[in-house]
UniProtKB/Swiss-Prot annotation:
Protein name: Ferredoxin-2
Gene Ontology molecular-function annotations: 2 iron, 2 sulfur cluster binding; electron transfer activity; metal ion binding
InterPro entries assigned: 2Fe-2S_ferredoxin-like_sf, 2Fe-2S_ferredoxin-type, 2Fe2S_fd_BS, Beta-grasp_dom_sf, Fd_pln
Function description: Ferredoxins are iron-sulfur proteins that transfer electrons in a wide variety of metabolic reactions.
Keywords, comma-separated and alphabetical: 2Fe-2S, Chloroplast, Electron transport, Iron, Iron-sulfur, Metal-binding, Plastid, Transport
Domain 2Fe-2S ferredoxin-type: start-end pairs: 2-92
Keyword Protein biosynthesis: no
Entry binding sites for [2Fe-2S] cluster: C38, C43, C46, C76
GO cellular component terms, semicolon-separated: chloroplast
SUPFAM superfamilies named in the record: 2Fe-2S ferredoxin-like
Note on how the cofactor is bound: Binds 1 [2Fe-2S] cluster.
Cofactor dependency: [2Fe-2S] cluster
Family annotation (NCBIfam families): fdx_plant
Length: 95
């Protein structure tokens, strides 16, 4: 499993995320309450920003190349591919 540090408005939380689990699902299993809506990678409710490390969000269909290039991630369809740090609650920063 990878260690994923989530920087939330209520503080930093580090959780373990298996390579085949979506980050949002793992966060919920750890008792964290993160924003989401569609859970299908087709909206921006769950958006976060990768501060360090790498993720795979090839299942997402909402973010354009520029947004992905700036580090934005849809946590509902993102897998960790290394230990990483992600700022959550970033939907407003997208626009």
């Amino acid at each position: 499993a990878y260690k994923v540090t989530l920087k939330t408005p209520s503080g930093d939380q580090t959780i373990e995320v298996s390579p085949d689990a979506y980050i949002l699902d793992a966060a919920e299993e750890a008792g964290l309450d993160l924003p989401y809506s569609c859970r299908a990678g087709a909206c921006s409710s769950c958006a976060g920003k990768v501060e360090a490390g790498t993720i795979d969000q090839s299942d997402q269909s909402f973010l354009d190349d520029d947004q992905q290039g700036r580090g934005f991630v849809l946590t509902c369809v993102a897998y960790a591919t290394s230990d990483c740090t992600i700022s959550t609650h970033q939907e407003e920063s997208l626009y």
